């Protein structure tokens, strides 16, 4: 927000405060002033000149020889190259000795043999940004109104002795996106009064309602719409003071009618729009939602395709403007416009924001509607605009307005105690001082025994709770005045929760196993949201109300899809060996209207080589057992390995023969496996394995305690066993049966071979186990080991129908 220091003085008396002092004070009150710009940029010696004579240069067709009165004893001759120079004009003249931006000094010169005693200036040459110069003067010199005094300071007329404060407003302070809002802020800081604009509106006997009717179909999106007629306007330039104020605010002057709507926007923060009444095509205004695919050509000469949630202003059939964003070219005010219909409305910020984003079209008006405007200024703004059009465009303001008013402006009362204010701020401000601050803020209030009941004006939508009032007191008191104190109270030593400790263990182990941590988006697209879920969920994923894109429109139900995107991205860039893991949240949908259930999961993906450096030995490709080994090591670290089993599973998107559920105490908590070949093809990856499991359920299980034992002094005995079983037999279940049957002497069971070759019967396979027997107190005898081993053989024969392989 650019704030003209001189313009601001019209609303609050700050003549005793310099612009820099004001900037410092505003910054200390909580609104950052990013800079103060002096508009004249060091320019000196530029005056108003009157062109007495103008003729072609005898030696150059594109130059003119001018005799110009600059308010001195004798007129001066100046050679000018501007195409729009002419006799009788009043123009800015840089005299000999004048200084222009960049410390450029004007000297006497000869141009093609003719003397030149000065320079006729364009606005750009006086330091004004070319983007802010009206089209009329974009390629030529500036021309003053005919009543400009010859010899007067041109910079004063152009308001270039002004200073502009640039405010860096946060989204909650939309009330300062206009001059009156800033005036209220400055008045509160200095304890002064705000002088509101005087509206001198003379209306004709004719009524606006005789020319136009207004109806609103989309009442929720447009609760208030006001229209007013101004007839017989004469389009021309706006007054100089208005043009200079608009340029200081960063707005290019266009014409008197358009400039007035922009001026009101900057003064009140109320966006207005002016229609050429004679181009409307009907005598009615209908505000409705657009039809899907409806077309409109906007003021920037672009054809826009509308969607059904966009709000439009129509003549009953055809769209005339995109509400709150931009007007239509068909009803644009031009030099031929005679009758003007002014619009002042309150459009829902959410609707305007979505429309603006969809169309890729952002304007000063849309920015203010998005952040929220003061609905109580809507009528005052349109009346002031009509008065200015009557005065500066020669128009006739018709009596009254036509409105569709469904707006319910509810009074907000927020209460706070003086005790709370002082407790939160660490101050000792009296209740009377606080009352003075609320008075300076123009917040009506009542006080009962130290409790303030504050009626918050509509211009301050950011004040909703007592803490907001505490902030207002703190801002006006001055944060730099709050006394410095040491921390008080009991110091509590921080520590990690059990879940935090376990998460650190997970990260430490997986990184030690060669996986890199990834952090992916919690948002995903509709087609990926339900992929690779640990538990099937029939409810629809949670949708964002206003997603930035379709790719990030739903909350994820699995971590795997985003990790696969990361793998695909790496593989496409020739990084073929990737091992990633993520600890993150998924969002399980609940009943309609309730918040989703957030649950912490662990997921990982591995592809390419597991070992690929020479010092690690032979290269090893990632397979099911490599990934399973990583998980088994993790479960050992977490103390739940004896409670974990694996069960073959068929899951969508996973390889049907290389996928298993991870089961904890009989409950499926995750899965592990290889991607389905079709999924690998879509991602353009090969040999890719994934896993995902619920950390909530793992952490919620009591971990086995870790015991330490002395290094054994007695030897152990090893027996191997190869048995033939059906292909459906699970090695993990057999290993568990062997461990139970072997008793206390059997300390370790390892599967070291799986054979399914030509020599095996159809439907059979061979499993080979190595069993280690040991007693820490003595040396075992062969008979003791044989007895335990026979129990193992008997158990697997009875349980699985196993036969010793011969």
Swiss-Prot record:
Annotated GO biological process: phenylalanyl-tRNA aminoacylation
Domain FDX-ACB: 712-805
Entry keyword set: Aminoacyl-tRNA synthetase, ATP-binding, Cytoplasm, Ligase, Magnesium, Metal-binding, Nucleotide-binding, Protein biosynthesis, RNA-binding, tRNA-binding
Binding note for cofactor: Binds 2 magnesium ions per tetramer.
Domain B5 intervals: 409-484
Binding residues for Mg(2+): 462, 468, 471-472
SUPFAM superfamilies: Anticodon-binding domain of PheRS (SSF54991), Class II aaRS and biotin synthetases (SSF55681), Nucleic acid-binding proteins (SSF50249), PheT/TilS domain (SSF56037), Putative DNA-binding domain (SSF46955)
Reactions catalysed according to its record: tRNA(Phe) + L-phenylalanine + ATP = L-phenylalanyl-tRNA(Phe) + AMP + diphosphate + H(+)
Compartment(s): Cytoplasm
GO molecular function, one term: catalytic activity, acting on a protein
Cellular component terms (Gene Ontology): phenylalanine-tRNA ligase complex
Principal EC category: ligase
tRNA-binding domain mapped to chain residues: 40-155
Cofactor(s) needed by this chain: Mg(2+)
The EC number(s) this enzyme carries: 6.1.1.20
HAMAP family named in the record: Phe_tRNA_synth_beta1
Subunit structure comment from the entry: Tetramer of two alpha and two beta subunits.
Protein family (similarity comment): Belongs to the phenylalanyl-tRNA synthetase beta subunit family. Type 1 subfamily.
Full protein name: Phenylalanine--tRNA ligase beta subunit
Taxonomic placement: Bacteria, Bacillati, Bacillota, Bacilli, Bacillales
Gene this protein is translated from: pheT
């Amino acid at each position: 927000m650019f704030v003209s220091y001189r313009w601001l003085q019209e609303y609050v008396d700050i003549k005793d405060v310099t612009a820099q002092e004001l900037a410092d004070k505003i910054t200390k009150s909580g609104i950052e002033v990013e800079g103060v710009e002096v508009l004249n940029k060091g320019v000196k010696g530029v005056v108003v000149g009157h062109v007495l004579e103008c003729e072609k240069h005898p030696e150059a067709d594109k130059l003119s020889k001018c005799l110009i009165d600059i308010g001195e004893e004798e007129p001066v001759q100046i050679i000018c190259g501007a195409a729009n120079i002419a006799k009788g004009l009043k123009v800015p003249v840089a005299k000999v000795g004048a200084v222009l931006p960049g410390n450029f000094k004007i000297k006497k010169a000869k141009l093609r043999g003719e003397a030149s005693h000065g320079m006729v200036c364009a606005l750009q040459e006086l330091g004004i940004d070319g983007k802010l110069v009206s089209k009329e003067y974009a390629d030529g010199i500036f021309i003053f109104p005919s009543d400009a005094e010859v010899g007067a300071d041109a910079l004063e007329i152009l308001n270039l002795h002004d200073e502009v404060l640039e405010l860096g407003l946060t989204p909650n302070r939309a009330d300062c996106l206009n001059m009156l809002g800033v005036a209220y802020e400055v008045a509160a800081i200095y304890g002064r009064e705000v002088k509101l604009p005087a509206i001198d509106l003379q209306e004709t006997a004719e009524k606006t309602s005789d020319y136009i009717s207004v109806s609103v179909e989309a009442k929720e999106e447009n609760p208030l719409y006001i229209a007013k007629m101004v007839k017989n306007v004469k389009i021309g330039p706006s007054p100089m003071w208005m043009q200079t104020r608009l340029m200081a605010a960063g707005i290019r002057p266009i014409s008197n009618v358009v400039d007035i709507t922009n001026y009101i926007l900057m003064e009140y923060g109320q966006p207005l729009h002016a229609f050429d009444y004679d181009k409307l095509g009907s005598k009615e205004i209908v505000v409705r939602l657009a039809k899907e695919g409806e077309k409109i050509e906007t003021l920037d000469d672009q054809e826009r395709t509308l969607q059904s949630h966009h709000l439009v202003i129509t003549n009953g059939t055809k769209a005339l403007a995109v509400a709150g964003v931009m007007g239509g070219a068909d009803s644009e005010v031009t030099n031929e416009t005679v009758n003007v219909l002014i619009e002042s409305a309150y459009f829902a910020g959410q609707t305007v924001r979505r429309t603006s984003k969809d169309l890729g079209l952002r304007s000063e008006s849309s920015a203010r509607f998005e952040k929220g405007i003061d609905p109580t200024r809507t009528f005052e703004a349109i009346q002031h605009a009509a008065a200015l059009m009557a005065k500066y465009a020669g128009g006739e303001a018709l009596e009254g307005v036509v409105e569709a008013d469904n707006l319910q402006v509810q009074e907000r009362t927020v209460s706070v105690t003086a005790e709370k204010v002082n407790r939160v701020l660490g101050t000792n401000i009296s209740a009377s001082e606080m009352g003075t601050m609320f008075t300076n803020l123009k917040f009506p209030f009542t006080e009962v025994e130290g409790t303030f009941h504050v009626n918050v004006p509509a211009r301050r939508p950011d004040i909703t709770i007592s803490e907001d009032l505490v902030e207002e007191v703190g801002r006006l008191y001055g944060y730099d005045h709050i006394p410095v104190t040491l921390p008080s109270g009991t110091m509590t030593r921080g520590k990690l929760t059990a879940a935090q400790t376990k998460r650190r263990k997970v990260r430490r182990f997986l990184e030690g196993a060669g996986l890199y941590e990834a952090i992916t988006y919690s948002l995903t697209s509709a087609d990926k949201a339900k992929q690779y879920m640990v538990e099937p969920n029939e409810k629809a994923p949670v949708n964002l109300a206003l997603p930035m894109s379709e790719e990030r429109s739903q909350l994820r139900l699995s971590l795997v899809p985003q990790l696969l995107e990361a793998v695909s991205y790496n593989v496409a860039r020739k990084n073929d060996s990737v091992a990633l893991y993520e600890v993150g949240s998924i969002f399980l949908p609940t009943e309609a209207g309730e918040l989703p259930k957030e649950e912490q999961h662990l997921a990982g993906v591995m592809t390419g080589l597991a070992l690929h450096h020479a010092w690690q030995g032979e290269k090893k490709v990632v397979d099911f057992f490599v990934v399973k080994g990583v998980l088994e090591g993790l479960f050992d670290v977490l103390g739940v390995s004896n409670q974990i089993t694996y069960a073959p599973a068929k899951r969508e998107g996973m390889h049907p023969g290389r996928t298993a559920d991870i089961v904890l105490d009989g409950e499926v908590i995750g899965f592990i496996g290889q991607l389905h070949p079709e999924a690998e093809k879509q991602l353009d990856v090969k040999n890719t394995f994934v896993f995902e499991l619920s950390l909530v359920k793992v952490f919620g299980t009591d971990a086995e305690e870790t015991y330490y034992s002395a290094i054994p002094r007695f030897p152990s005995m090893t027996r191997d066993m190869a048995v033939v079983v059906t292909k459906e037999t699970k090695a993990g279940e057999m290993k568990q049966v062997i461990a139970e049957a072997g008793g206390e002497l059997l300390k370790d069971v390892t599967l070291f071979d799986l054979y399914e070759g030509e020599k095996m019967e159809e439907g059979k396979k061979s499993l080979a186990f190595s069993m280690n027997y040991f007693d820490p107190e003595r040396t075992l005898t062969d008979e003791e080991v044989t007895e335990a081993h026979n129990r193992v053989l008997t158990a697997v024969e009875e349980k699985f129908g196993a036969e010793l392989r011969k």
